[in-house]
Each structure stands twice: as structure tokens, then as C-alpha cells.
């Protein structure tokens, strides 16, 4: 399912268990995708972008990822709306204090960006780093998401 958002098009996919993917690039949709899950995801994302939702109540079905990555993705869900933490702080939270770069890689592999809020993780010096592989467009999206959550002042 494709949806238009203030940060561009998002493509969603789900299986019978839960949401499997959110992508900024077109994806092959599961022909057996659960339409109710996709419809709920679309509604909740639209509410988020309208400033009416701060957390998501969607079932996930994450088939890929290492145990470490899944631990990171779980910890990301604990970062409150409108707040940020550094890669180092997140590494300490998951009790792998030297795994700062691995945290960045896990964020990059996050199958459900926005819903699993990897955009809330910033560099040690407070700079925005590492969204969608450090592409310029990715950092613009990260900034927009943080501005939406009022974690950053809006830049005109």
C-alpha cells in the first residue's frame, strides 16, 4: 500500500500477523497482505503526521534482523515522542556501551521507520546523523520528523 505523507511517499506491507515493512522506496507488496492491518497503519500514520498521534498500536511481524538488531528496535520504541537520545545513550541502554556503530547499522536496517522511531537517535554532539544511510534527503526527512514532534525548532 502506498500513502502520501509530508515526508514523501511511504510504501507499507503486512502479513497475516502484522506490519512487515515501511519503506521510502517502492516495495513488492505481499499478495496475501492483511488489508485491515494496512488500513490501520495508514490511519495511524496519517494521525501521526496530523499531530494527533504520539505512539503506534500496530502489530508487527518482523522476520528479519539479528537478535542485536531486534534488541535495538525494541529499545527505540521506548524513546518518547518529542524526545531524542544519542547513539551512545542507546548503546548504554541496551547494555552494549561500545556498540555505537552497530546501533547505527541496526537503525539503518529498521524495517519500520517512523513506527519504530529510529529518527529520534542523534549524534553525540547533538547533530542529526545517520538517517537512510546519511543521504541528504534522509537527513531532511529526519529533521522534518523531529520538527513534527517538536523535538527540534522548525527551520524556515
Language-model features and meaning:
Residues 1-98, 148-156:
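Basic nucleic-acid-binding alpha-helical/helix-turn surface characteristic of O6-alkylguanine DNA
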Residues 114-121:
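Short Lys/Arg-enriched helix C-cap and helix-to-coil transition segments
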Residues 10, 84, 106, 125-128, ...:
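Gly/Ser/Thr-rich beta-alpha loop segments that engage phosphate groups in nucleotides
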Residues 4, 47, 61, 100, ...:
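Short glycine- and Lys/Arg-enriched binding-loop motifs that mark or flank ligand-binding interfaces
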Amino acid at each position: 500500500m502506498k500513502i502520501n505523507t509530508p515526508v514523501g511517499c511511504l510504501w507499507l506491507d503486512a502479513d497475516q500477523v502484522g506490519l512487515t515493512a515501511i519503506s521510502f522506496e517502492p516495495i513488492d507488496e505481499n499478495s496475501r497482505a492483511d488489508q485491515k492491518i494496512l488500513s490501520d497503519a495508514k490511519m495511524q500514520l496519517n494521525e501521526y503526521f496530523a499531530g494527533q498521534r504520539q505512539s503506534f498500536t500496530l502489530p508487527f511481524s518482523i522476520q528479519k534482523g539479528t537478535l542485536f538488531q531486534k534488541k535495538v528496535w525494541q529499545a527505540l520504541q521506548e524513546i518518547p515522542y518529542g524526545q531524542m537520545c544519542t547513539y551512545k545513550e542507546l548503546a548504554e541502554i541496551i547494555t552494549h556501551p561500545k556498540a555505537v556503530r552497530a546501533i547505527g547499522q541496526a537503525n539503518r536496517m529498521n524495517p519500520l521507520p517512523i513506527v519504530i522511531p529510529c529518527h529520534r537517535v542523534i549524534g553525540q554532539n547533538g547533530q542529526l546523523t545517520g538517517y537512510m544511510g546519511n543521504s541528504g534527503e534522509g537527513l531532511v526527512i529526519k529533521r522534518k520528523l523531529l520538527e513534527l514532534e517538536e523535538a527540534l525548532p522548525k527551520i524556515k
